[in-house]
Amino acid sequence: MTITRKSHPLMKTINHAFIDLPTPINISGWWNFGSLIGLCLIIQIATGLFLAMHYTADTLTAFSSVTHICRDVNYGWLIRNMHANGASLFFVCLYLHIGRGIYYGSYLYKETWNVGILLLFMVMATAFMGYVLPWGQMSFWGATVITNLLSAIPYIGPDLVEWIWGGFSVDKATLTRFFAFHFILPFIIAALAMVHLLFLHETGSNNPLGISSNCDKIPFHPYYTFKDLLGVVILLGLYMTFVLFFPDLLGDPDNYSPANPLNTPPHIKPEWYFLFAYAILRSIPNKLGGVIALVMSILVLALFPILHTSNQRSLTFRPISQCLFWILVTDLLILTWIGGQPVEPPFVIIGQVASILYFLIILVLFPLAGLIENKMLKW
């Protein structure tokens, strides 16, 4: 008997997931981002592995080892720039993927959605720890400020911070453990992504109309493999443009100075993809309140399936909800801008208004709009 993709145990699994998978006929380019996130993860793991071969996780030599990679290692500058900008690309794809899920009601696949939220938290943790590794000024102070937020947790907070630091400040122990976690987490993310796919293939993909597509499906290959391939070519084009022409555009100039615990940078801020959450954190003058708001800014995604009140799944035929969705997108862009600004008027009040609006749209206005649209359509 010949071994075919339909009979071989391993090939059979791959076949069901990527070749003969029944896929809705009408899914648009917004469905490309899942595969693009997978590509980003592969690029990050590959470039990260080569960086880890030359990097030393020691406070005295970490900064020098990154310089050594860029100057002395064959194509080290390219690998380092690919890894640094790959993180930005990863988050662009993630946010667009989540936005697609919200717009088209994909969050109603609860298991897939919840695993996705867990994946987002893990990717954010990995990116944060990776930012600490070059041991520049912003690496050190970013690590100090963000880990210090845990001290706001009642009773166990201060002990928890010292436990994470491995001492009384961010030092060698912190850097070593951050490197260890930064190395292992992407592999856990890859495994969890498989679980994400497993749950998705239990239900099948959603589509722009938000209705069942069981009556009209096509095989994933060759139709969507080639469609995804177009996305890959566009993505790699944008990616390599950034890597080769503007490698430092998204970075912070402060991170080109070695970490100095005696000199605080004037504006401590995380990478651009965390600025919206950082703005929400800073909008609340209370430390514990800020930390809760920071966590809730991501965790609020888990409430989408519970707060879905409309009789339609997608926003395709829901004009009020569409307006709210694009206001939410604009609000997130404003929060991202505010997160990069100093804490002074008028930025403080703009950030506070934008933070309130963010939670108001998700928790109140979206469910309300769903009910109004049901009435308008007499459903």
Swiss-Prot record:
Subunit structure, per the record? Answer: The cytochrome bc1 complex contains 11 subunits: 3 respiratory subunits (MT-CYB, CYC1 and UQCRFS1), 2 core proteins (UQCRC1 and UQCRC2) and 6 low-molecular weight proteins (UQCRH/QCR6, UQCRB/QCR7, UQCRQ/QCR8, UQCR10/QCR9, UQCR11/QCR10 and a cleavage product of UQCRFS1). This cytochrome bc1 complex then forms a dimer.
The residues the record assigns to binding heme b b566 are H97, H196
Q: Could you state a single Gene Ontology molecular function term?
A: metal ion binding
Q: Name one GO biological process term.
A: mitochondrial electron transport, ubiquinol to cytochrome c
Give the subcellular location.
Mitochondrion inner membrane
For this chain's record, the cofactor binding note is:
Binds 2 heme b groups non-covalently.
Q: What is this protein called?
A: Cytochrome b
Say what the protein does.
Component of the ubiquinol-cytochrome c reductase complex (complex III or cytochrome b-c1 complex) that is part of the mitochondrial respiratory chain. The b-c1 complex mediates electron transfer from ubiquinol to cytochrome c. Contributes to the generation of a proton gradient across the mitochondrial membrane that is then used for ATP synthesis.
Where along the chain is a ubiquinone bound?
H201
UniProt keyword list: Electron transport, Heme, Iron, Membrane, Metal-binding, Mitochondrion, Mitochondrion inner membrane, Respiratory chain, Transmembrane, Transmembrane helix, Transport, Ubiquinone
Instruction: Name the predominant localization.
Output: mitochondrion
Record PANTHER family? CYTOCHROME B (PTHR19271:SF16)
One Pfam family matching this protein = Cytochrom_B_C
Family annotation (Gene3D superfamilies): Cytochrome Bc1 Complex, Chain C (1.20.810.10)
What does the entry list under GO cellular component? Answer: mitochondrial inner membrane; respiratory chain complex III
Which top-rank group of organisms is this from? Answer: Eukaryota
Which CDD domains does the protein's record reference? cytochrome_b_C, Cytochrome_b_N
